[in-house]
Amino acid sequence: MNDDLLGKEYIANWTLNAKQHFDDGDYEWLCDIIQQCFPEESCKRILELGCGAGYSTLAFLLRDYSVISVDINDEAITHTDNLIKKHDYTSEIKTIDGPDFSQADALLWKKDLVEEWGMIYALTKQQESFKSIDLIVLCNPGGNISRELTLREKDLLTSGGFTCEEICNNIDNGCIDLLHKWAVIYAACALSKATGIPLLIVERETEGEVNRTLVQISNDVNMEIAKAFSRPIKNAPDGGTLLKNTMDTTDQLCWGAAVYLPVDSQ
């Protein structure tokens, strides 16, 4: 399956789940975390790494944040654009090689910003343009990914801490989504370190696994957890993004969130 078809499949599968999370108040909870951790006057512009179906973007806008969202999936960008415009917000879709902050409520960057999902790493080269960003948000990292895409981007995985042997073993064992998830997480942490901007990571797993994941991230990438939060998922969607294939699917799924601060910036 090519990347365009994967993008359409992702939006088709995720939109109903994302709408359910929105209706259940999960994204409101996420906004509450931001307001609890960051005073309103100190956090006005959010950089969202991956907009998905657009419901998290909409939730941010409803709380009066301005949002810059970057996604490699053109279908996700289009869906998000349509969704927020239905709620009377303005947005601009741009294909650019660096941040260009507009007066719109939301600025959506298309995947041509850089090649494939290595885009987050490439953003670290634009540090001077991030002075007006107050918070980076990475929500439920992952998404659909093909075997070919993982192999093509294995250099990013090795720079994120994986050995070539680990990459091959995980691909052979069908754990491609896990590799993709961690590569994106490492990239987001690298961006936070390079810019000195706090990073909010939100993960969806069982309660025990999400806690281990949040701690493991901080240890692996030398990031300090300032605050951590959790919230049970009321209506757990089928095929949720889980860290381990062997996980007992009868366990309660929950949202886990943590505010990460680069240790060097303390």
Features from the language model and the residues they span:
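Conserved alpha-helix/loop element of class I SAM-dependent methyltransferases that forms part
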Residues: 23-42
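S-adenosyl-L-methionine
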Residues: 86-125
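Conserved SAM/SAH-binding beta-strand->alpha-helix loop
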Residues: 73
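Conserved SAM-binding loop
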Residues: 80-81
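Conserved SAM-binding loop of SAM-dependent methyltransferases across substrates and taxa
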Residues: 53-64
